[in-house]
Regions:
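Shared catalytic-loop signature of beta/alpha-barrel
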Residues: 213-217
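Conserved C-terminal alpha-helix-loop-beta "cap" of PLP-dependent enzymes
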Residues: 227-316
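Conserved PLP-enzyme active-site core in the AAT-like
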Residues: 3-206, 210, 220, 225-229, ...
């Protein structure tokens, strides 16, 4: 379904990262698999650009991996990746996630070119960036050796699942490092029910009309923006772009003239209220400034009215 040589259902994306790392460190060698996380004598370093460090990259450390950072916060030069790759390098990590790829860092294509020229596999985490459905295929097609995708986010399969797809030899190695084998991935077991549930969800997901889906999300976001009306100091818009907001979002920008509570204060109040409303907020959660962003993917019909009501309650609270 994904156009990959092979694939494996994992116990979520984080478990998929563990198996990615284990496959690149120990391969399919039984003696090495049994030794993890002792990586003595094995390639175990994973090169990653500084802006691509993320909350789950500790998963690479579980089987004994070590992350090697390159670049600055908003810039990476090709020579930095070239110089970082050495005898201990097991892989190059590339994160596809909102607000993590400023224009000055190495692109996916550049990472693939440099890493592959030195015999190093490229590992891609695209867990939170599906839809668009194209992301299921693009990175495998364009050079990734392994790609991890969440089964429970946009695909809407079991929340405890993920998909690890890529080169046949690396998927075989990941499988040998996983349950039911007595290996580093034994604790991250997937049941037959989860596997069937994810495969079924993926089939349904691929059969959906993405254009119509995006239009629904856009309409929901437009309804939220319209419902807010004119709040002095707040600029509400619908945004979508191919990098940072791949789905339509209703975004509230706090203008310099705004004199009310901060975006963070509004976010916390929304989460603590009745009903609980969870929104994205500010740069620490993937954003530009002190804005609030609302993703429509998990909303049911009628939820937008509740969101508008709660937003207005908190924005006008004095």
């Amino acid at each position: 379904m994904l156009g990959a040589e092979a694939a494996l259902v994992t116990a979520g994306s984080a478990a998929g990262l563990v198996l990615q790392a284990a496959a690149c460190i120990a391969g399919d060698d039984p003696s090495r698999i049994a030794r993890l996380p002792d990586v003595t004598g094995m390639r175990h370093e994973f090169v990653i650009q500084r802006p691509h460090r993320f909350s789950y990259d500790q998963s690479f450390r579980v089987p004994g991996g070590v992350l090697v950072e390159i670049g600055l916060g908003r810039r990476t030069m090709p020579y930095e990746l070239e110089n970082a790759i050495g005898p201990a390098t097991a892989g190059a990590v590339y994160l596809v996630s909102p607000f993590t790829s400023p224009p000055g860092i190495l692109s996916f294509d550049e990472v693939c070119r440099i890493a592959h020229a030195r015999g190093v596999p490229v590992l891609v985490d695209v867990a939170s960036m599906v839809p668009p459905r194209e992301n299921l295929f693009r990175y495998l097609r364009d050079g990734a050796d392994l790609v991890i995708v969440s089964g429970g986010k946009g695909i809407r399969g079991p929340q405890s699942t993920g998909i690890l797809a890529g080169r046949r030899d690396l998927i075989r190695a990941a499988t040998l490092n996983a349950s039911p084998n007595q290996a580093i991935g034994r604790a991250a077991k997937t049941s037959k029910e989860e596997i069937v549930g994810l495969v079924t969800a993926l089939e349904l997901f691929l059969a959906e009309d993405e254009k119509a889906e995006m239009e629904r999300y856009r309409e929901v976001c437009a309804s939220i923006v319209a419902g807010l009306g004119e709040v002095p100091g707040i600029r509400a818009v619908v945004e979508q772009d191919p990098v940072n907001r791949v789905l339509p979002h209703a975004v509230l920008y706090f203008e310099p003239s705004w004199t009310g509570p901060s975006g963070r204060a509004v976010q916390l109040a929304l989460a603590a209220g009745d009903p609980h409303v969870y929104v994205q907020q500010g740069p620490h959660q993937g954003g530009y400034f002190d804005e609030i962003a609302i993703d429509a993917i998990n909303l049911e019909p009628g939820d937008e009215a509740i969101i508008v009501r709660r937003l207005l309650e908190e924005l006008t609270r004095r």
